[in-house]
């Protein structure tokens, strides 16, 4: 797909000309229009803007001028009423996604706004998704923007909200969490419980439920999801889809459409577009932040790190979704494996029937006594690299091939590093959490030859080259 910047100028010029033509046509129609009758009043009600917060649309009252206007002919009235009340033709959104697969973000945005009018809104998080607002402006169509204020955003994010409103002349429709629910959570578990038992509970209260309320007042929404944001969980995002997780205005499954105009755009191209259009951006980006969320759960990333490594860094890669886009998660391990991973093998050994992994002559299977011995030594004959794993964990299974290849390279001539594994689920989990820095599976530790305390591998990149660079920098 061509980058966002490659197509922006031609589309923006064309759409501005189109907008001018539309305005002229509308003025002529208004001047020639007869007085509105009952049918026009019905059409007005059908087009009424639905409030974002409401579960059901609010009916706009008929204006005094419309009420006083003479009634139209019965035949014309019946025809107009039938046109207003007739159900919209069904849309095959899978086919539409294929049709728009090669379209630019501007074209996709224009199609979305044209199809849904005031019943669609842009979800704005205060990060680089400001590009969505710029694309919407360039279409020349009216648009709405909403945002989730969790109460724990960075000051820079709130400052960006204000700048965006002034820059585009809009009012962002803010959604807030239920005060009673947040109060109960904080009183029961404290302000930072997500560091201990995961972020999902906090995100449900502060983000997911407010989003659900917002979407019940819409027929469609627009997100800034990109495939390259999280290749492990967002690789299959289409540009448009029936929302698999949330309900819209009509209620029930299939009542909400989700648009992802930048799904196929590379993050670098998004930033090229933002700089070219000179739009306001979050000041945190200049401080090394890429993916931006709540202040306690967001941090800068280093050069070479993936942007999602700055979010919920204490959890595994596939746990790094707050729930807003859970329907797009590519769950390669299956729901059962994900549930077992979250439980951490609390029941016995997690999945007792799972075959063992990391089996190779180059990988030493350590017992608890062996690990305790490694911990006691202040000086070792050679470094040790040890993976703490659970055989049922899909993330452990996914790194098996790279770990075995690493063992061959480190154990060969000139390698000089012992490679081991320690099964840390079940009855060994408490020990691993207390003594071995275990928070999630897999955890990789390097025991240097001249340092007593093991060093935990900080990244989620578990390919051979990344692991080898970690070992060589500390051995």
Swiss-Prot record:
- Transit peptide extent on chain: 1-63
Enzyme class, first EC level, given as a word: oxidoreductase
Q: Which UniProt keywords apply?
A: 4Fe-4S, Amino-acid biosynthesis, Chloroplast, Cysteine biosynthesis, Disulfide bond, Iron, Iron-sulfur, Metal-binding, Oxidoreductase, Plastid, Redox-active center, Stress response, Transit peptide
**Highest taxon of the lineage:** Eukaryota
Example GO molecular function: adenylyl-sulfate reductase (glutathione) activity
Q: Which NCBIfam families is this protein grouped with?
A: APS_reduc, PRK02090.1
Sum up the protein's function in the record's words: Reduces sulfate for Cys biosynthesis.
* Protein's UniProt name: Probable 5'-adenylylsulfate reductase 1, chloroplastic
């Amino acid at each position: 797909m061509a980058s966002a910047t490659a197509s922006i100028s031609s589309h923006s010029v064309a759409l501005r000309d189109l907008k001018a033509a539309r305005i002229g046509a509308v003025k002529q129609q208004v001047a020639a229009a007869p007085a509105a009758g009952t049918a026009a009043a019905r059409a007005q009600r059908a087009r009424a803007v639905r409030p974002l917060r409401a579960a059901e649309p609010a009916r706009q009252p008929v204006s005094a001028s419309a009420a006083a206007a003479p009634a139209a002919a019965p035949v014309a009235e019946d025809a107009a009423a039938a046109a207003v009340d007739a159900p919209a033709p069904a849309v095959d959104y899978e086919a539409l996604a294929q049709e728009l697969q090669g379209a630019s973000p501007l074209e996709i945005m224009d199609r979305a706004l044209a199809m849904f009018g005031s019943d669609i809104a842009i979800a704005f998080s205060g990060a680089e998704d400001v590009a969505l607002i710029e694309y919407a402006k360039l279409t020349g169509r009216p648009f709405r923007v909403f945002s989730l204020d969790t109460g724990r955003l960075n000051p820079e994010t709130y400052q960006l909200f204000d700048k965006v409103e002034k820059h585009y002349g809009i009012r962002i429709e803010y959604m807030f969490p239920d005060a009673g629910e947040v109060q109960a959570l904080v009183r029961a578990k404290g302000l930072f419980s997500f560091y201990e038992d995961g972020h999902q509970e906090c995100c449900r209260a502060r983000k997911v439920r407010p989003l659900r309320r917002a979407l019940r007042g819409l027929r469609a929404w627009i997100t800034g999801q990109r495939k390259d944001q999280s290749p492990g969980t967002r690789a299959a995002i289409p540009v448009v889809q029936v929302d698999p997780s949330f309900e819209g205005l009509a209620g029930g499954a299939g009542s909400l459409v989700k648009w992802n105009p930048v799904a196929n755009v590379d993050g670098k191209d998004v930033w090229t577009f933002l700089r070219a259009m000179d739009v306001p951006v979050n000041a945190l980006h200049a401080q090394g932040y890429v993916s931006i969320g709540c202040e306690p759960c967001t941090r800068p990333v280093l050069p070479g790190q993936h942007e999602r490594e700055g979010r919920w860094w204490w959890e595994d890669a596939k746990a790094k979704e707050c729930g807003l886009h859970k329907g797009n998660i590519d769950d390669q391990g299956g729901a059962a494996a994900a549930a077992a991973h979250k439980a951490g093998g609390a029941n016995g050994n997690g999945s007792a029937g799972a075959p063992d992994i990391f089996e190779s002559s180059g990988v030493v299977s350590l017992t608890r006594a062996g690990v305790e011995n490694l911990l006691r030594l202040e000086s070792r004959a050679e470094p040790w690299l040890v993976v703490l794993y659970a055989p049922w964990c899909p993330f452990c299974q996914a790194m098996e091939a790279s770990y075995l290849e690493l063992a061959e390279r480190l154990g060969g001539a000139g390698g000089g590093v012992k490679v081991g594994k320690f099964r840390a689920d079940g009855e060994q989990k408490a020990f691993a959490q207390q003594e071995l820095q275990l928070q999630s599976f897999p955890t990789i530790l390097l025991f240097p030859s001249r340092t007593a305390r093991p060093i935990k591998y900080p990244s989620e990149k578990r390919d051979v080259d990344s692991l080898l660079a970690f070992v060589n920098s500390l051995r």
